[in-house]
Regions:
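N-terminal secretory signal peptides and thylakoid transit peptides that target proteins
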Residues: 1-17
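Structural motif
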Residues: 36-41, 79-82, 123-127, 170, ...
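Beta-propeller blade signature
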Residues: 43, 127-133, 178-190, 232-239
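A short beta-strand motif characteristic of beta-propeller blades
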Residues: 49-54, 90-97, 136-141, 194-200, ...
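Blade-loop segments of beta-propeller domains
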Residues: 54-109, 117-118
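Repeated scaffold domains used in trafficking and secretory/extracellular systems
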Residues: 58-65, 102-108, 146-152, 205-210, ...
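Asp-box/WD-like beta-propeller blade repeats and closely related beta-sheet repeat scaffolds
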Residues: 98-108, 117-153
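Short, conserved, GDST-rich strand-edge loop motifs in beta-rich repeat architectures
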Residues: 117-122, 161-181, 221-231
Length: 337
């Protein structure tokens, strides 16, 4: 991994392209992306025009917005996270991980505070870093499991997808425990980080991504075993019970390579993307409605002003019925402001 200094990022910020458009205080969409060899944060408005870009030192992954700031985290394992000005894309602060740890790719904000997942370099035990609006560390507390990935917040606390993978930061894509992986959904208290609940997933099923709404919490997973033996990849937490949700008719874990890439709520429906199967699902857990839609390399999903947006590694982004073709290769996730 690369060592990143504040000076390096200040130089990078001078290379950023900043452009404002009349009538828009903040961009509509923020996403990590790639253009040639460059890794960027891309800020778009509703019709796909670029408002600004920010040059990153490596591949970015998760983002969050709060008031006038945006936070971006590098893809795991990462030794950097950044606070950017949401309107202009200018760099405000660099956040290093705690000593002996790396960031695991996701961040969530609540009022003036933000929470980043991180893990120990040895053993991958999970922690949550609590920071203020300028990147100052408020606290660090256990995540309740190994390898925390996506975090979401509601009035019950911080929900954490502890993926269960033990890795080495020098060999990040080698899972050291592929046959003994233990993943869980945990909930910690926002104020003091006290662990409230831990709900286990089936062995070797890695919980990766979460979405929360008044209809409950949805979780998307990746299976580490033989695809033909995969348990359900999509789960629904209703109250205190975690329930599996089957895929649409004609879809199997084999057809999506046992991997769901992102998840979101759209009204009463759960949207789950399967980039390796070139498809996304619309599922209503209350009525058992389930339907598959095809889209090449679709992964990012968000809801903006009540409308569903998706993005792909092929450079497509927008509402499914009005996708815009761009010059960027979008990463797995984006946020709709």
């Amino acid at each position: 991994m690369m060592g990143i200094s504040r000076r390096t990022f200040i130089v990078s910020s001078l290379l950023s392209t900043t452009q404002s458009w009349a009538g828009m205080r903040y961009p509509a969409i923020l996403s990590c992306a790639k253009n040639g060899k460059d890794h960027l944060v891309v800020a778009l408005n509703d019709d796909g025009r670029c408002e600004w870009t920010f040059l990153l030192p490596g591949r970015g992954h998760g983002l969050a917005v709060r008031d006038d700031m945006a936070i971006v985290v590098g893809r795991r394992p990462s030794d950097w996270a950044l606070i950017l000005d949401r309107a202009s894309g200018e760099l405000r602060s660099v956040i290093p991980p705690p000593d002996g740890m790396t960031f695991t790719g996701h961040v969530v904000c609540h009022h003036s505070l933000c929470f980043l997942g991180c893990q120990a370099n040895q053993g991958s035990m999970g922690y949550i870093l609590k920071i203020d609006h300028v990147g100052g560390v408020e606290a660090i507390f256990p995540s309740g499991g190994v390898e925390p990935h996506e975090l979401v917040i509601d009035d019950k606390g911080i929900f954490v997808a502890n993926g269960g993978r033990i890795t080495d930061p020098d060999l990040p894509w080698v899972v050291l425990n592929p046959n003994t992986l233990v993943s869980n959904l945990s909930r910690v208290r926002i104020g003091d980080g006290k662990l409230q609940d831990v709900i286990p997933l089936p062995d070797n099923l890695s919980l990766r991504h979460l979405a929360v709404s008044r209809h409950g919490l949805a979780g998307a997973c990746q299976w580490s075993g033989v695809p033909q033996q995969s348990p359900p990849l999509l789960w629904w937490l209703k109250g205190s019970r975690l329930m599996p949700l089957g895929p649409p008719d004609g879809v199997s874990a084999v057809s999506v390579n046992a991997y769901l890439g992102s998840v979101a709520w759209w009204g009463e429906n759960i949207i789950a993307t399967a980039p390796r199967g070139n498809q996304y699902w619309v599922i209503n857990p209350s009525t058992n409605f389930a339907r598959r839609f095809e889209q090449v390399d679709v992964c990012g999903v968000s809801v903006r002003k009540g409308r569903l947006w998706i993005s792909s590694g092929e450079g497509m982004i927008g509402r499914p019925e009005a996708l815009m073709d761009t010059r960027w290769t979008f990463d797995n996730h984006f946020v709709g402001a």
